[in-house]
Amino acid sequence: MQPPGDDAAPRCPFAGAHAPDAPHVPEAAGDDAQAGWHRAQLDFSQSMSYGDYLSLDPILDAQHPRSPDHNEMLFIIQHQTSELWMKLALYELRAALASIRDDALPPAFKMLARVSRVLEQLVQAWNVLATMTPSEYSAMRPYLGASSGFQSYQYRELEFILGNKNAQMLRPHAHRPAIHAHLEASLQAPSLYDEVIRLLARRGFPIAPERLDADWTQPTRHDRTVEAAWLAVYREPNAHWELYEMAEELVDLEDAFRQWRFRHVTTVERIIGFKQGTGGTSGAPYLRKMLDVVLFPELWHVRTTL
């Protein structure tokens, strides 16, 4: 009840013109007029639906467990969704590469930030797979054959674009000529970081000619002229703001990539221990060795120098 003499309580701005002053009492859930969906389109016989737009039928029909074990569905979906996230990461990285070549850095910043968020999604996905116990994995492992995430061609392209080049990693894809050719082109092209170093040179930093004309099929190696350029950027960030922001986007990206690798190792150790991987690698020891790979070395070295 409103005390005498007080002004009327303000009406809710979202209420209708004839809304009562009394508190609103929700209608029964079955009342179509209040359900919120009564004007939604319900007939899609002549138009595109949500499932049509997303091609959900082939996506949801792509899980084909080979074992009778209940947990294999988790294993399949974990890896399929990871491949979809990697597809997006590659899409954004290719666009970022093109923007950097064109000196259009603000769009590249957005794309690189998105890749870092994709990698965070991939890190969290390991938490779902980690609900699988060693005994559950052992029940389905014989059905995997020699298939292994080591053979993921999208992951290999991701490594190549980020600068971890290794021509031997083309061999698992020799039986698929189109994929092999695509990966070989990525191996021979400048990496993301190579393009950023070319950007440093275009902005007037004295980068060694041999670094600008390197063998792109080799993994990234530390270069003192590149570190000197980044040192100048970090010492005067306001004078080189775009390059400073680029450096931090790259550090964010590698940090997220390292976390993804680390979570992969710990999940493998949790589920299979130190058994050999299905693809023939040493398993967890191989994955631990990959933790030592540094994608953008000068950006980490410069932090010690500052």
From Swiss-Prot:
| UniProt similarity note | Belongs to the tryptophan 2,3-dioxygenase family.
Q: Recall the taxonomic lineage recorded for the source organism.
A: Bacteria, Pseudomonadati, Pseudomonadota, Betaproteobacteria, Burkholderiales
- What is the documented function of this protein? Heme-dependent dioxygenase that catalyzes the oxidative cleavage of the L-tryptophan (L-Trp) pyrrole ring and converts L-tryptophan to N-formyl-L-kynurenine. Catalyzes the oxidative cleavage of the indole moiety.
- So where does heme get bound? H264
What is catalysed by this protein?
A: L-tryptophan + O2 = N-formyl-L-kynurenine
Renumbered to this chain, region (Disordered) spans 1-33
Q: What is its EC number?
A: 1.13.11.11
Question: Pathway involvement?
Answer: Amino-acid degradation; L-tryptophan degradation via kynurenine pathway; L-kynurenine from L-tryptophan: step 1/2
Q: How is the cofactor bound?
A: Binds 1 heme group per subunit.
- EC class name: oxidoreductase
InterPro entries reported for this sequence: Trp/Indoleamine_2_3_dOase-like (IPR037217), Trp_2-3-dOase_bac (IPR017485), Trp_2_3_dOase (IPR004981)
User: Which positions in this protein are listed as binding substrate?
Assistant: F75, I76, I77, Q78, H79, Y137, R141, T278
Entry keyword set: Dioxygenase, Heme, Iron, Metal-binding, Oxidoreductase, Tryptophan catabolism
Q: Which residues form a coiled coil?
A: none
Entry protein name: Tryptophan 2,3-dioxygenase
GO molecular function terms listed in the Swiss-Prot or TrEMBL record: heme binding; metal ion binding; tryptophan 2,3-dioxygenase activity
Which is one Pfam family of this protein?
Trp_dioxygenase
One BP annotation, GO: L-tryptophan catabolic process to acetyl-CoA
Organism whose genome encodes this protein: Burkholderia pseudomallei (strain K96243)
Which gene carries the instructions for this protein? kynA
Cofactor dependency = heme
Query: What is known about its subunit structure?
Result: Homotetramer.
